[in-house]
Amino acid sequence: MKKLLREASEYLLSRGIRFPQREAEDILMDLLEISSRSALHQAKLSSEEQSLYWKRLRKRGDRCPTAYIHGKVHFLGVELQVTPQVLIPRQETEIFVEQIIGYLQMHKEKTTFYDVCCGSGCIGLAVRKHCPHVRVTLSDISPEALAIAESNARSNALAVDFLLGDLFDPFSFPADVLVCNPPYLSYKEFFESDPEVRCHEPWKALVGGVSGLEFYHRIATHIHKILVSGGVGWLEIGSTQGEDIKQIFHAKGIRGRVLKDYAQLDRFFFLENQANDAVSSGEVSGFSER
C-alpha cells in the first residue's frame, strides 16, 4: 500500500497537483469507502480496484476536480450529487449558509425562500433541512443543473419546489428571503482561472460577461419584484467586486452591505427591500462587513 500511494503521489505531483499525497489518499479512501487514514494503510486492493484507482488518478491528473471524481459532496448534513453540469459547493458558502439558517430560525415570520441560480441545490436544500417551516423554491436556467438539484432533493427526502428559467423570470410572486449565486466572473478572470475551474466546471454558471457585473445590474433593477417589502437577500459576489456592487444597488435606492470572508475577501452582498431594521437584524457572524 505504501508503494502504491507513493507512486500515486508522485504521479499527481508530476501533473501539477498542489497536495499530491493528501489527494492520492483521499481518492483511494473514497474508492474503498474508508473514512480513516490509519485504516487506509492496512487495506488491500484487488487488481480491479487498483485499475479503478489509477483511472481516477488519471482524471485528477487531467485536473478534473476531486468532487467530480467522487461524484458527491456533503453540505450541512445534505449529501449532494455533483457532476460537471453544476458548480462544486465551496466551503465559504457552507459557512455562510449556516448563518442564513440561523437567521431564518430566529425570524420565524420569514416563510418563503428562493434559491436562484441553484445549481446542485446545496443552499436551498440545506435551508429546507434545517428550517422545515420555510417553503423553499429553487430555480436555474440550466435544465441539466435543475435535474441534478431535483435528484438531490429526492435522495435527501426534502420537499421543495423547482422552477426552470432565467434569473427571476419563472417566479410569479415575491419571497421573504432570497439567495442568489449568479455568474460573476469576467471573461478575462475565467480564462485566467485554474484548470479545475476553466476546463471542468460549467462556464455558463461562472461567466457574467465582459465585466462580470452584468447580472447584478439585472438583479438591482428587478429586486422589488422578487422580494416582498421588508424582504432580505444575500448574493454571492467576486472577491474584488464589493464596492462596485454596492454602488450598483445604491443607484437603485437599495441599501446593502458587503460581507467579507475569513481571508478578508469580498464574498457576499446583503440587501434589504425597504425594510426598516433588516440590515441590522441580518448580521452574519463570522463575516466582517463594510
From Swiss-Prot:
Protein name in the entry: Release factor glutamine methyltransferase
Alphabetized NCBIfam families for the sequence: hemK_fam, RF_mod_PrmC
Binding residues annotated for S-adenosyl-L-methionine, in chain numbering: 140, 181
Family from the record: Belongs to the protein N5-glutamine methyltransferase family. PrmC subfamily.
Organism this protein belongs to: Chlamydia trachomatis serovar D (strain ATCC VR-885 / DSM 19411 / UW-3/Cx)
Residues the entry annotates as binding substrate: 181-184
EC class (word): transferase
Classification via CDD domains: AdoMet_MTases
Record has Methyltransferase as a keyword: yes
GO BP, sorted A to Z: methylation; translational termination
Keywords noted in UniProt: Methyltransferase, S-adenosyl-L-methionine, Transferase
Function: Methylates the class 1 translation termination release factors RF1/PrfA and RF2/PrfB on the glutamine residue of the universally conserved GGQ motif.
HAMAP family xrefs: RF_methyltr_PrmC
InterPro entries named among the record's database cross-references: DNA_methylase_N6_adenine_CS (IPR002052), HemK-like (IPR004556), N5-glutamine_MTase (IPR050320), PrmC_N (IPR040758), RF_methyltr_PrmC (IPR019874), SAM-dependent_MTases_sf (IPR029063), Small_mtfrase_dom (IPR007848)
Reactions listed under catalytic activity: L-glutaminyl-[peptide chain release factor] + S-adenosyl-L-methionine = N(5)-methyl-L-glutaminyl-[peptide chain release factor] + S-adenosyl-L-homocysteine + H(+)
GO terms, molecular function: nucleic acid binding; protein-(glutamine-N5) methyltransferase activity; protein-glutamine N-methyltransferase activity
EC number, UniProt record: 2.1.1.297
